[in-house]
């Protein structure tokens, strides 16, 4: 089920010099529904509204990512989005995004902005060794006709690969809360290994998600916090494959 909340457009006299670009956030939720209120508080300062897909009625291990994204992209376009911000309930943007959003969305043409994807291993520290220090999430992009998107893989981009999108980096941080709890790291590894046993969608596989060999952490800089602060509940936030094994 799709729900949305779109802020009223500014009066025309306030946008005579330059029309404000409308940024609509899109996300879906299921096992992480309880994280949505804090997500909305996090993104409210820099979006013009949001569209959400309530996936809690699903019964399988993992519902159709392609189908959910198609619905969200179309709903955002119908809501008048110039730009789309794709996010998950367990992600938080640094507060500086609010001051930078206007400049980011001023760029012409098809652009996908990449954020430094910081995998938190504690509420205030993220991992930086190896692959962990170089992750980029291109999640702010120009709105487009969802019919252009034909990708079907588990980890596909939100925007079409061969449609002229320029991938740029904004240097801002996007913090991922899911990896804070060690149990979730293992559960995430197991879930993706179950969904992609032949590694067709990710050649390196998923064991690295729970491998702490050589772990190096870096504290979130004092001038780059996210808001609101996160208090971890220790929940799994995803399908528990142990339940599936028990039922079998």
Regions flagged by a language model, labelled:
Residues 70-83:
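Active-site nucleotide-sugar/metal-binding loop of Leloir-type enzymes
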Residues 49-58:
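A short beta-strand-loop structural module common to alpha/beta enzyme folds
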Residues 2-8, 70, 95-248:
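Catalytic-site signature of metal-activated, phosphate-bearing donor transferases
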Residues 22-24:
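Cell-envelope/extracellular polymer assembly enzymes that use nucleotide-activated donors
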Residues 81-94:
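Short beta-strand-to-loop acidic/aromatic patch adjacent to the donor-nucleotide binding site
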Residues 6-15, 31-45, 52:
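Short, well-formed alpha-helical segments that are part of the catalytic scaffolds
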